[in-house]
Amino acid sequence: MTPSEARDQICATGLSLHQRGYVHATAGNLSVRLDDGSFLITPTDACLGTLQPERLAHVGADGVQTSGDRASKTLALHRRIYAADPQARCVLHTHATHLVALTLAGVWQAQDIVPPITPYYVMKVGHVPLAPYRRPGDPATADWVHDTLAASVAAGRPLRAVMLDRLGPVVWHRSPAEASAVLEELEETARLWLLIGRNVAPLSAAQIDELRQAFGAVW
């Protein structure tokens, strides 16, 4: 997509997420990698519901900002995800309510914050590990996510999301629309898991294998 199209998609995605309650106040950030290796990212402390295309931060492939308002404090995290996964063209971070609540109540496993309880979770989201708590913007978080993602790519099972303990999910995909779809499925699964009291059996290995065979699910 062109830089102009990317700016418009970032603003439209931010507005949609804000209107539907996936982000609040100035929480969350969003970026798109452009064809030349540079990327656009939302400004620090910006409300995703009121983004303006011309105020988005443009950052070169070298990490140097060239225009726009000051880039999000999670700039390093976005850059490290793009470095680890060549297929990633959009990174999205929110403070989604049920996912944050899940980290406070206790996740299923460190390597899978919720179990595979629905077929669409397996097909659209996949494994979501829990990143240890660190302050927002801590470079150590970016390093952890990069190393975890790089290992999954090398193993042939690339991740689409990680969960930052007490902060929120980080998801990535080929476009803002696809990243948003992953976020929504992940948040909905966390909501279901909490709603039922976290006491339902996950899909069986045979059921998950059927999803692999029928739909190419990566699990």
Model-derived features: positions:
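Glycine-rich flexible loops
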Residues: 1-219
